[in-house]
Amino acid sequence: MKTYLINLEESRRRRALMEEQLIRLQIDYVIVPAINGHRLGVAEISSLCNMDNVSKYPEWLSPGAIGAALSHRLALSCLVEDDERCGLILEDDVILPNNLASILEQLESLYVDDELILLYWSSDRMHPLRRETAVSIDNGHELAVSSEPASLLSAVGYIVGKSVARRIIALNTPVRVTSDLWASFLEGKAMKQIRCLAPSPLRLANLPSDIGYGRQHFLRRAKHWLEMKLPLIHRLSARRREAYFSRRQKYTWV
């Protein structure tokens, strides 16, 4: 299974982090050049996006989020063009497990058409997974169907097949939702089910967001600068991010 790593050209620190891991773990990967939404002009955004949605949800469809949606769309297009049965779409701020190659090999054999597999996911509630669908994977992880897939978020790492990739591209051209609004893609019948790997084998790296949901670009840059200049602030912020996302990955069996 090929991995499609999304990375902004200027994010050299992130690329170095990811390439060191992928090479060490012997993962077949290609780099997908991410699109920096903050560099898109008004005319470009108007031509690439559903402006009714951008106007209605400016906090979510921010320039950074629009760039992320375009970047994920490009990664999905690369998968389709490569004629891969399925592939891993991966963002560039992740700590990978040492057994990732084994996990991907198992998931490739278990992948079924018209589904999405989330290796990293987030939910605003205790997320229910269907016990009768669970399949054991390396190191105590289990792959199971979500009972409430519409509540799932995060596009940090997911496995997708060609048919689902094509439908997601079609549904989000022009960009009308963020790259991780799986509820919208489910409603549009891009996939029939979502399976989650629980607990998630991926961890977020302690790197500031390059997207900046719901923040002004200047404030995001200022916060980044402060965290880099003041190690204690950076450590505290990193711990808060880790604790926050850990709370959003709790699940229960039903």
Across the structure, where does each feature detected by a protein language model lie?
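An acidic/histidine-cluster motif and surrounding catalytic segment
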Residues: 1-90, 94-254
